[in-house]
Amino acid sequence: MISIRNVTFSYSGTGQGKIENINLDIEKGSCVLLCGRSGCGKTTITRLINGLIPYFYEGELSGSVEVAGMEISKTPMYQIAEKVGSVFQNPRSQFFNTDTDSEIAFGMENLAWPLEKMLPRVKETLKAINI
């Protein structure tokens, strides 16, 4: 479902580090933990997967990132948002909700899903992740 191929990225004009020649495949249904020291590229990799790079963080990018068959650099942000979300390390920095159900529904609400479609999807997701 997620494929990162020969990706190298360096941020423009920030002096921030870069990642070099990253290759990673993540199968549908997998749970992956990115860990490492500060500045090693964890956040950069998540920004590549969720489309923030190249749309909101400029820099030099080579290689390819595909999510659900979509090449991230060639896909409109709204289509990426239908497939990708982020969960932050600190729960207090999560979006705007205080409960799990609302967090799960957040993306669907922003895409204007009807309630009768959202509720079963929230229940299905909670069951899939054993909550």
Model regions and ranges:
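A short, flexible loop at the N-terminus of ABC-type nucleotide-binding domains that lies
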Residues: 1-4, 9-22, 53-58, 74-76, ...
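Conserved hydrophobic segment flanking the Walker A/P-loop of ABC-type ATPase nucleotide-binding domains
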Residues: 26-28, 79
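Short, conserved post-Walker A segment of ABC-type ATPase nucleotide-binding domains
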Residues: 32, 43-56
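The feature captures the beta-strand-to-loop junction immediately N-terminal to the Walker
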Residues: 35-38
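Short helical segment in ABC ATPase nucleotide-binding domains corresponding to the A-loop/adjacent helical element
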Residues: 50, 85, 92, 98-109, ...
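Conserved ABC transporter NBD signature motif
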Residues: 58-70
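Conserved ABC ATPase "signature" region
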Residues: 69, 116-131
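ABC ATPase NBD coupling module
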Residues: 70-85, 110
